[in-house]
Swiss-Prot record:
One of its GO terms (molecular function) is N(6)-L-threonylcarbamoyladenine synthase activity. The lineage of its organism: Bacteria, Pseudomonadati, Pseudomonadota, Betaproteobacteria, Burkholderiales. GO terms for cellular component: cytoplasm. This is tRNA N6-adenosine threonylcarbamoyltransferase. It catalyses: L-threonylcarbamoyladenylate + adenosine(37) in tRNA = N(6)-L-threonylcarbamoyladenosine(37) in tRNA + AMP + H(+). The gene is tsaD. SUPFAM superfamilies: Actin-like ATPase domain. Binds 1 Fe(2+) ion per subunit. HAMAP family: TsaD. Required for the formation of a threonylcarbamoyl group on adenosine at position 37 (t(6)A37) in tRNAs that read codons beginning with adenine. Is involved in the transfer of the threonylcarbamoyl moiety of threonylcarbamoyl-AMP (TC-AMP) to the N6 group of A37, together with TsaE and TsaB. TsaD likely plays a direct catalytic role in this reaction.
Length: 346
């Protein structure tokens, strides 16, 4: 089965072709980072318009790279939610228009399910069941993943997502957009232990997260730094130390909660998905913990940590292989800007 995947939930336009027998044949991605940088964040209207411009050229790119023809495609999967309403509507409209014109069925995919399953795209995918740490700009969750469509929420953030905390910390430090990679790069120049920040809920009995207090602690420290240093190299070094303190605190919490989830479920496999999963400090800490504690940790390829069409094509193919009745030829669709992943549990 050959599935075309279309991702347009936020500021990346992604298309891909996934074959259930041959794997990922091709994927193409356009990021809108440069366009949104001058605004310091994603502008929804601009994002939607750019998806319209980019989708069909990316489709041609994917078809050319894979050697596939439109007649070879068996179904079209698209991100139905969650995400920006306008951006979702663009992707859904294009998917259904193509499906109608080509006489193909469609299937709407939960964006986070795509992230959860994205580590299955590697050469040696982890077998079910596993614990998944889903960590991105909008979500931070720990899930038990028993099979496709069989998900149990173990813990989640009570306020800010980890990626959101990274982005807001970057703004407090006067860094550019996107903030997450910028604050991580600055942290690498900081001195370990020079600034020690709180680890919210590190020792709580549950598996939930909270990052708003950590963000507030960064704000407090930043005000002190600006009052003590008018500027110059001293302030820049202090900001690097503060960035290091923030990243160390966030990573400590993510690692500790992941270990607790593995212990609670008695599983030995951890999958890390979402944009923050590309963070080098987080990967290093989890790999060290895995070696020490004797569990396996799996990540998507770095190129597939961000939003992408490959994960949507994969999720669509896996769902249609298990539940062919989920394919639709109605070509009437809704999008779900807010959509609880737990609602997919079977």
């Amino acid at each position: 089965m050959l599935v075309l995947g279309i991702e347009s939930s936020c500021d990346e336009t992604g298309l891909a072709l996934y074959d259930t027998e041959r794997g990922l044949l091709a994927h193409a991605l356009h990021s809108q980072i440069a366009m949104h940088r001058e605004y310091g964040g994603v502008v929804p209207e601009l994002a939607s318009r750019d998806h319209i411009r980019r989708a069909l050229p990316l489709l041609e790119e994917v078809l050319a790279a894979s050697g596939a023809r439109r007649d070879d495609i068996d179904a079209i999967a698209f991100t139905q939610g969650p995400g920006l309403a306008g951006a979702l509507l663009v992707g859904a409209s294009i998917a259904n228009a193509l499906a109608f014109a080509w006489d193909k069925p469609t299937i709407g995919i939960h964006h986070l399910e795509g992230h959860l399953l994205s580590p299955l795209l590697v050469a040696e995918p982890p077998p079910f069941p596993f614990v998944a740490l889903l960590v991105s700009g909008g979500h931070t969750q720990l899930m038990r993943v028993s099979d496709v469509g069989v998900y149990e929420t173990l813990g989640e953030t009570l306020d800010d997502a980890a990626g959101e905390a990274f982005d807001k910390t970057a703004k407090l430090l006067g860094l550019g957009y996107p903030g997450g990679p910028e604050v991580s790069r600055l942290a690498e120049a900081g001195t370990p232990g020079a600034v020690v920040l709180p680890r919210p809920m590190l020792h709580s009995v549950d598996l939930d997260f909270s990052f708003s207090g950590l963000k507030t602690a960064v704000l407090t420290q930043m005000k002190k730094l600006e009052a003590a240093h008018a500027g110059g190299a001293v302030l820049e070094r202090a900001k690097a130390d503060l960035a290091r303190g923030f990243v160390d605190a966030a990573v400590d919490v993510l690692v500790a909660k992941s270990l607790a989830a593995l212990k609670a479920t008695r599983l030995k496999r951890l999958v890390v998905a979402g944009g923050v999963g590309a963070n080098r400090q987080l990967r290093a800490a989890l790999s060290a913990a895995a070696q020490k504690r004797g569990f396996d940790v799996h990540y998507p390829d770095l190129a597939l940590c961000t939003d992408n069409g490959a994960m949507i094509a994969l999720a669509g193919a896996l769902r249609l292989a298990r539940w062919p009745s989920q394919a639709s030829r109605d070509y009437a669709f809704t999008v779900k800007p807010r959509w609880d992943l737990a609602s997919l549990a079977r």
